[in-house]
Swiss-Prot record:
Protein name: Photosystem II reaction center protein M
Membrane topology: Single-pass membrane protein
Protein task: One of the components of the core complex of photosystem II (PSII). PSII is a light-driven water:plastoquinone oxidoreductase that uses light energy to abstract electrons from H(2)O, generating O(2) and a proton gradient subsequently used for ATP formation. It consists of a core antenna complex that captures photons, and an electron transfer chain that converts photonic excitation into a charge separation. This subunit is found at the monomer-monomer interface.
Source organism of this protein record: Synechococcus sp. (strain JA-3-3Ab)
Keywords: Membrane, Photosynthesis, Photosystem II, Reaction center, Thylakoid, Transmembrane, Transmembrane helix
InterPro entries noted in UniProt: PSII_PsbM, PSII_PsbM_sf
Subunit (UniProt): PSII is composed of 1 copy each of membrane proteins PsbA, PsbB, PsbC, PsbD, PsbE, PsbF, PsbH, PsbI, PsbJ, PsbK, PsbL, PsbM, PsbT, PsbX, PsbY, PsbZ, Psb30/Ycf12, peripheral proteins PsbO, CyanoQ (PsbQ), PsbU, PsbV and a large number of cofactors. It forms dimeric complexes.
Similarity-based family: Belongs to the PsbM family.
Lineage: Bacteria, Bacillati, Cyanobacteriota, Cyanophyceae, Synechococcales
Location in the cell: Cellular thylakoid membrane
Gene name as annotated: psbM
Length: 35
């Protein structure tokens, strides 16, 4: 069970971290284009 929990946590991190990074880049580019 611990390995499954760690695997699930790792999968969530692998999915969330790039998503947050892309959102930050999108917000920066959109704010730059507006101004």
């Amino acid at each position: 069970m611990e390995t499954n929990y760690l695997g699930l946590l790792a999968t969530i991190l692998v999915i969330l971290v790039p998503s947050i990074f892309l959102v930050i880049l999108y917000v920066q580019t959109s704010s730059k284009s507006e101004s």
